[in-house]
Amino acid sequence: MKILVTGGAGFIGSHIVEYLVQRGDDVTILDNLNTGKIENLSKVNNDINFVNGDIREYKLLEKLVSDSDGVFHEAALASVQQSLKMKDEYFDVNVSGTENILKLAKEYGFKVVYASSSSVYGNPKQIPIKESDDRSTVNPYAQTKLEAELLAEKYSEMGVKVIGLRYFNVFGKRQSKEYAGVIKLFLDRIQQRKPPKINGDGLQTRDFVYIDDVVKANILAMDSDINYKFLNVGSGLPISILDLANLVIDASGLSLKPIYCPALSGDIKTTQADLTSIKKLLGWQPKTKLRDWLIEVISSKKFECI
């Protein structure tokens, strides 16, 4: 297949690229290197076509997708805290940029699998969260993801093949410093023999899913006969931030206690994915357990894995 990966030098995108190259696909990457890094592609540099550009550049996008079989759309701005200060920029990239891809999909007929987010649910009324549950955002980043979903719905009615994967909290190697998740932040502190810092009371829960499992969900979605759907991608196994901090400390063998800091604006209290749909429709299920991965990384000091 001939595939374009937007944001292909980023955390999730670069792992998708590696999988596609290994499979033998013809892969082009579009990335402006705002948070992505060329070194993330070091394993596949000789097997890809890399274009330094922006998803807001319509003519450039058109040139790249006109003969594509599919697009994995991972390019986005993804910091909740940053979105509070840069609302217009976030809308421009995450909404207008996504619409560019959907417009071109309508014209050229390729399938789109793109990164949505569990943040579209806001603070859920019930746990676990099903795809049919209410969407009620609590920060500008989440609102851009919801607006992109509304566009996907609109374009699907025009015949565009599009699947939105609602990522929960993805962890693994290559997370950028700008968008680092709490696991990376905790492990960075432990590596320095410093205690993890917790924002708020630590009782907020998160649903963590490993990067390799996320890649597999993307591949299955693209290869499926499904033409339109939103699907949760998580582990279905929530853990509180306090329990996560203590797990990291225990695995390190250090005598530390978490440091409590003020809660973050726009933070969600609890989240947990219902995986019924993605298991049924794609035959997907997560394989990597957070606890096992953390113990392996910390006990063997494989901090390059973050």
Protein language model annotation of sequence segments:
Residues 60, 100-104, 208, 213-216, ...:
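Conserved mid-core alpha-helix of short-chain dehydrogenase/reductase
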